[in-house]
Design a protein with these regions (language model features):
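Active-site cofactor/cluster-binding pocket
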Residues: 2-204
């Protein structure tokens, strides 16, 4: 992942979720964890129109071993994380994933269900059930965002769980951090993949 010559190697992660699921927060925590993990350039940004609960939202995390000088994210990401699998029918999610990329979904289904003709790796984990099990529920809403950070760590190998846990701890009070870290760990352990994924040359 180190830079070669003058070219910046930037890893692009796109988050797809719905308003209220915490996708933007997850993107920001991942950026912070990547920085803790030693990446020199990190950014996180949301993309949505009128934000309302339940409406589709998109957020991006970008990180690089060298400072990021290109502000515009690439059209296709190395990793796409989907907080609500029903969005697969509502949004062209695969259109924003590189042909050899990694798709991570909050789903109780096996990863093979989401395999396509594209040469992608697929990872699934039932973050919703795990979040409910550990008590990540606020006003009836199950908070799955930090759980999927655990799935990201296991499936991608790009950011360590240790760094994710440190970033989570910096964003929540001690009691909430403990619950979120437990959810992330359990989701990490429960993550299933159709095959091992390795990062190819990331684009700018």
């Amino acid at each position: 992942m180190a830079a070669e010559g003058k070219e910046e190697k930037i890893i692009n992660v796109t988050w797809h979720g719905r308003g209220g699921q915490g996708g933007v927060t997850a993107a920001m925590i991942l950026a912070e964890a990547a920085y803790i993990d030693g990446y020199k350039g990190v950014t996180a940004a949301p993309f949505f129109g009128v934000e309302r609960r339940g409406a589709p939202i998109t957020a991006t995390t970008r990180f690089s071993r060298t400072p990021i000088r290109t502000l515009t994210p690439t059209a296709k990401a190395e990793v796409v994380v989907v907080l609500d699998e029903r969005l697969m029918q509502a949004v062209d999610i695969l259109g924003g994933l590189k042909p050899d990329g990694l798709l991570i979904l909050n789903s109780s289904s096996p990863p093979e269900k989401f395999c396509t003709d594209m040469d992608i790796a697929v990872a699934t984990s039932d973050a919703s059930s795990i979040a409910e099990e550990v008590g990540l529920v606020v006003a009836g809403t199950v908070l799955i965002n930090t759980c999927l950070l655990g799935a990201f760590s296991k499936a991608s190998g790009l950011v360590s769980m240790e760094s994710l846990e440190k970033a989570i701890s910096k964003n929540f009070n001690p009691k909430a951090a403990q619950l979120n870290i437990r959810g992330a760990r359990l989701t990490c352990e429960a993550t299933r993949m159709n095959r091992v994924w390795q990062l190819s040359s990331p684009g700018i």
